[in-house]
UniProtKB/Swiss-Prot annotation:
Record-annotated Protein kinase domain positions: 191-453
Amino-acid positions noted as binding ATP in the UniProt annotation, renumbered to this chain: 197-205, 220
Name of this protein: Beta-adrenergic receptor kinase 1
Keyword Disulfide bond: no
Organism: Didelphis virginiana
GO CC terms of this entry: cell projection; cytoplasm; plasma membrane; postsynapse; presynapse
């Protein structure tokens, strides 16, 4: 029966994998719903306050670029050629071979440069043209050949197009997507969890599918009770920090994190899914690797280490078991549980796996940095070639003996190794860190320039264009079955109680890596969600027009911000009422949908603007004169933050203004009229945006 369950789990998992690769959007069991277009008023202010509404910030984001591109192609005729030119250059930069780049560069030059020069309509500088021409004449086609044009195209976008984009509906759509991104609160319900694929000291790893996009991931679940029992809180939190440091930027050689979240019982990391097993497993199945095969793995691992070290992260646990293969045979470094940030302080701790730890790591009280990883790389490459660590000969398992040999033994390299390989390993396994390869001041660049890698095109490595020496079997789960992986004994943690103080440790644990979420959305549901939202918004706009509803009430007024909130403020009312609010320098107005604003609250009536909590939801509390109160609830975190800030700012400025207004004897004053005579012109107006 257990065998049948294992087979069914494998079949379900493999089917989910195949469907996810073919049509991930079709596998989505939840829908992403974009907020109303009116969210723009709040989100624009929220993003502006954080310096996010600039050309560089928006253009560098995947969804920002896609929407900017769509605006140029469909709504701005004069920008269309610039976008097409930019796209062609980006295609050129991704080409593998010099032959392909030669053909493509000539095509781009003829179509976008020479053609414009002949028609005297070339909009770019003479220096950019000469830069490209001179290299083409010398038959030089580096990947950055057109970089001067990229810079000038972006400058044109910045000067001529960006402001028009900000005023367009495409920027509104960008605000809608950013609101979704900044309000992600993941739970287990956001994933379909499949079979177990691994187990560690604190928990298990499962294959899973994200419900709203259909994308497959690995879910690493750590048990909070087990963490507490083993006093592993610092390790668990450190792994989350290290993953957040290395999971940005383009690096296909690290198992990166897209999300982190927690439940009352578990910490969960959502990671890249690797289906090809690990190098330790393949070494045992395949036998030792040849020099050329090892060079392939070494090159990809070196780029992974370079990415980590550029972020001041030392890995400290490099070994074949931590190198995972994807379904095509390319590798990624996994499990950053022992990684360490050395940007502010160098570590001293002796951590890692015996037989791979550098001498400076083993020596007590000695500080080290990325040097530790280059020594470990030498140990690992030796194992791929010989089947054992250079300091674990005769299958000794005595950790003290292995450490002693690491600190004292001169490594003997077989005569069968090529001179280039011997030189590489001697450099990496040098016990004196000041003479070790990779530790002489230039880091990974020293290793990449070693003669052993002379024939390697590192751009080809980065683009994963070299054929892997070993391709994992397709249609198989390259992991032990659930029975062999085993499970934790629940009795171990039966007496462990999680207190509020334990949960407080994980208060800041949840995280979404923006660029990875945007890439996931772009690859799966972006077009579908946009099309459905366009259709719904067009239908609603037509209906409002037919009913004669006013949708530009704030336009031309000194409205600071507007948008939907839910309110609860009537002593006889215990239900939330959704209303549309307008914040002015002297008052807060609101209305039900389709109605003219009919209710208002002046700043003179308000005593304080505070934050409160209603049933685990943060809300805004307005205390009103006469002991009354007014509670506002927002649909998303950014809205709550921005409404609270703007209400406090307006309230404070209104109070300062009221204090400056001389008290008029024997004459009652209307707070609305009196304040509206002196608008706070220094505050920005949303102008109906």
């Amino acid at each position: 029966m257990a065998d049948l369950e294992a087979v069914l789990a494998d079949v379900s998992y493999l089917m989910a994998m195949e469907k996810s690769k073919a049509t991930p959007a079709a596998r989505a069991s939840k829908k992403i719903l974009l907020p109303e277009p009116s969210i723009r008023s709040v989100m624009q202010k929220y993003l502006e306050d954080r310096g996010e509404v600039t050309f560089e910030k928006i253009f560098s984001q995947k969804l920002g670029y896609l929407l900017f591109r769509e605006f140029c192609l469909n709504h701005m005729e004069e920008a269309k050629p610039l976008v097409e030119f930019y796209d062609e250059i980006k295609k050129y930069e991704k080409l593998d071979s010099e032959e392909e780049r030669t053909v493509k560069s000539r095509e781009i030059f003829d179509l976008y440069i020479m053609k414009e020069l002949l028609s005297c309509s070339h909009l770019f500088s003479k220096s950019a043209t000469e830069h490209v021409q001179s290299r083409l004449l010398k038959k030089q086609v580096p990947t950055d050949l057109f970089q001067p044009y990229i810079e000038e195209i972006c400058q044109r976008f910045r000067d001529d197009v960006f402001q028009k984009f900000i005023e367009s509906e495409k920027f509104t759509r960008f605000c809608q997507w950013k609101n979704v991104e900044l309000n992600i609160h993941l739970t287990m319900n956001d994933f379909s969890v499949h079979r177990i694929i691994g187990r560690g000291g604190f928990g298990e790893v499962y294959g899973c599918r994200k419900a709203d996009t259909g994308k497959m991931y690995a879910m690493k679940c750590l048990d909070k009770k087990r963490i507490k029992m083993k006093q592993g809180e610092t390790l668990a939190l450190n792994e989350r920090i290290m993953l957040s440091l290395v999971s940005t930027g383009d690096c296909p050689f690290i198992v990166c994190m897209s999300y982190a979240f927690h439940t009352p019982d578990k910490l969960s990391f959502i990671l890249d899914l690797m289906n090809g097993g690990d190098l330790h497993y393949h070494l045992s199945q395949h036998g030792v690797f040849s020099e050329s095969d090892m060079r392939f793995y070494a090159a990809e691992i070196i780029l992974g280490l370079e990415h980590m070290h550029s972020r001041f992260v030392v890995y400290r646990d490099l070994k074949p078991a931590n190198i995972l293969l994807d379904e095509f045979g390319h590798v990624r470094i996994s499990d950053l549980g022992l990684a360490c940030d050395f940007s502010k302080k160098k570590p001293h701790a002796s951590v890692g796996t015996h037989g791979y730890m550098a001498p400076e790591v083993l020596q007590k009280g000695v500080a080290y940095d990325s040097s530790a990883d280059w020594f470990s790389l030498g140990c690992m490459l030796f194992k791929l070639l010989r089947g054992h660590s250079p300091f674990r000969q005769h299958k000794t398992k005595d950790k003290h003996e292995i450490d002693r040999m690491t600190l004292t033994m001169a490594v003997e390299l077989p005569d069968s190794f090529s001179p280039e390989l011997r030189s590489l390993l001697e450099g990496l396994l040098q016990r004196d860190v000041n003479r070790s390869l990779g530790c002489l001041g230039r880091g990974a660049q020293e290793v990449k320039e070693d003669p052993f890698f002379k024939a390697v095109d590192w751009q080809m490595v980065l683009l994963q264009k070299y054929p892997p020496p070993l391709i994992p079997p397709r249609g198989e789960v390259n992991a032990a079955d659930a029975f062999d992986i085993g499970s934790f004994d629940e009795e171990d943690t039966k007496g462990i109680k999680l207190l509020d103080s334990d949960q407080e440790l994980y208060r800041n644990f949840p995280l979404t890596i923006s660029e990875r979420w945007q890439q996931e959305v772009a690859e799966t549901v972006f077009d579908t969600v946009n099309s459905e939202t366009d259709r719904l918004e067009a239908r609603k706009k037509a209906k409002n027009k037919q009913l004669g509803h006013e949708d530009d009430y704030a336009l031309g007024k000194d409205c600071i911000m507007h948008g939907y909130m839910s309110k609860m403020g009537n002593p006889f009312l215990t239900q939330w009422q959704r209303r549309y609010f307008y914040l002015f320098p002297n008052r807060l107005e609101w209305r039900a949908e389709g109605e003219a604003p009919q209710s208002l609250l002046t700043m003179e009536e308000i005593q304080s603007v505070e934050e409160t909590q209603i049933k685990d939801r943060k809300c805004i509390l307005l205390k009103i004169r006469g002991g009354k109160q007014f509670i506002l609830q927002c649909d998303s975190d950014p809205e709550l933050v921005q409404w609270k800030k703007e209400l406090r700012d307006v309230y404070r400025e209104a109070q300062q203004l009221l204090q400056r207004v001389p008290k008029m004897k024997n004459k009652p004053r209307s707070p609305v009229v009196e304040l509206s005579k002196m608008p706070l012109t220094q505050r920005g107006s949303a102008n109906g945006l």
